[in-house]
């Protein structure tokens, strides 16, 4: 079973979301998603300053197996991207919840968080796959 940290929120598309002290949210893909994709070779990051809507594809993770869109779990403005992934995309594999984060977003509608899954619900989703 994949590691599913209890403090995070999850999308059905296997993104995770963590609220930061400054009120922004850090987004990445789950351990389960990176296991399915395999070794990362490139991550196409979104533009800082871009405005996205929940469900928009805003980044792409390319692995040895496939390219997979990464979706915005909430609407808002992209305020930072993980530039370390340009040289070290494998961080998504080795540290999916720490060094392998993909972007940070300032949510424009925090009520959208209610549609995300908690760890228990995400684990149940994984069991059904």
Swiss-Prot record:
The biological process GO terms on file are: glycine decarboxylation via glycine cleavage system
Q: Which UniProt keywords apply?
A: Lipoyl
UniProt remark on cofactor binding: Binds 1 lipoyl cofactor covalently.
Q: Please report the stretch or stretches of sequence annotated as the Lipoyl-binding domain.
A: 24-106
By its UniProt entry, which InterPro entries does this protein fall under?
A: 2-oxoA_DH_lipoyl-BS, Biotin_lipoyl, GCV_H, GCV_H/Fam206, GCV_H_sub, Single_hybrid_motif
The record's Gene Ontology cellular component field reads: cytosol; glycine cleavage complex
Q: Which cofactor does it need?
A: (R)-lipoate
Judging by the UniProt lineage, the source's domain of life is Bacteria
Q: Which residues carry this modification: N6-lipoyllysine?
A: 65
Q: What does this protein do?
A: The glycine cleavage system catalyzes the degradation of glycine. The H protein shuttles the methylamine group of glycine from the P protein to the T protein.
Which protein family is named in the record? Belongs to the GcvH family.
This protein's assembly is summarised as:
The glycine cleavage system is composed of four proteins: P, T, L and H.
Check the record and name the NCBIfam families matching this protein: gcvH, PRK01202.1
What is the name listed in the Swiss-Prot or TrEMBL entry for this protein? Glycine cleavage system H protein
Q: Which organism is it from?
A: Salmonella paratyphi B (strain ATCC BAA-1250 / SPB7)
* Gene (UniProt): gcvH
């Amino acid at each position: 079973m994949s590691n599913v940290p209890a403090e995070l929120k999850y999308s059905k598309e296997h993104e995770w979301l963590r609220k930061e002290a400054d009120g922004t949210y850090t987004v990445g893909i789950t351990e389960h998603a990176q296991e399915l994709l395999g070794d990362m070779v490139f991550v196409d990051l979104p533009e800082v300053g871009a405005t996205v809507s929940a469900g928009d594809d805003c980044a792409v993770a390319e692995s040895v197996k496939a390219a997979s869109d990464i979706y915005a779990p909430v609407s808002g403005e992209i305020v930072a991207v993980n530039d370390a992934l340009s040289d070290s995309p494998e961080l998504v594999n080795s540290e999916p919840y720490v060094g392998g984060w993909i972007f940070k977003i300032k949510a424009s509608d925090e009520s959208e968080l209610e549609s995300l899954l908690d760890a228990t619900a995400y684990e149940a989703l994984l069991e059904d796959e």
